[in-house]
Amino acid sequence: MSDDNNTTLTRRRFLTRGAMAASALALPYYIPASALGHDGAVAPSERIVMGGIGIGGRGSYDLGSMLAEQEVQWVAVCDVLKSRREAAKNRVDSRQGNKDCAVYADMRQLLAERTDVDAVLIATGDRWHALASILAMRAGKDVYCEKPACLTMAQGQTVVETARRYARVYQTGAQRLSEPNHVFAIEMARSGRLGQIHTAYADIRWRDGMRHDWLPAEPEPPKDELDWDVWLGPCPWRPYNQGYVNGGGWYHYYDFATDVAMWGAHSVAQALAGLDMTNVSFIEFEYEGPDATMVTRLSNGVKLVLFRVGGSVWEPCKFWHGACGERFDGPKGWVAAADDYSGP
């Protein structure tokens, strides 16, 4: 379309002109104001048609937030747990005042069948995040994926490559990058007021290690209630135990998650945002001390320290009080930010 406002024909204007042409005919024709986006309504042509993949826990919270947006029309939900997908459908139908929300047990079916879906929410367990995002973008969907975006560097690189190749919008849950206290710290670091940043810190909240053992085998539930193979997805097979599925128990196991990404998905992104990463790469990684602190060195000489504060996410540290923080040190001073921050 032309950039000239006089010649641009948007979908909204196209529909409006079509309605005017119809009214010129000697035929009775009624178009509701809501169909044209009048009276505060969003025209169907301007709505974002969405589907959800993984609607338990964080996914349930995200679903509620997105349903509150007037522009969003939710048409499908997918969850490997029957109880969750049915609860999500009922919630969507109640909010939208119809019974149109379709349910799926397998995301691949949703992505293949729902050509009307513009974007998907992905809030599965961490093990599925990267692969589900890649499959969705290949199917022509834009993606909002809960953090962490991936479990490995190779997965992350493939997610980025797929978004570029298929020209898709991809966003992961790094909301602290837009919260005022973190924005202030990041902008201070980049402004030069602290001088050239030489050291940055990020709180990764690493615990005492991930479990590698198996829970005792239990009988698998019926596949229509929970398909265990689909739940495992890209992970190595192990026998079913409800302890993995209920209450986020999977999060403590190396095959299903990476503990560093719990807070690191936020804090490392915040630290990197405050540094000038143009043509910069990581050149060295080294563990220091008994608390799993990792010191990384960048090719521009900056040192990035990823450290574990302690067992409690609210345990104070020497740099700040509060969770999920970052700090930048320069020759002229320092700045730090964290959730519910108070200075040391």
Language model: regions and residue ranges:
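Contiguous beta-strand/loop segments that form the cofactor/metal-binding neighborhood of enzyme cores
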Residues: 33-36, 184, 196, 201-205, ...
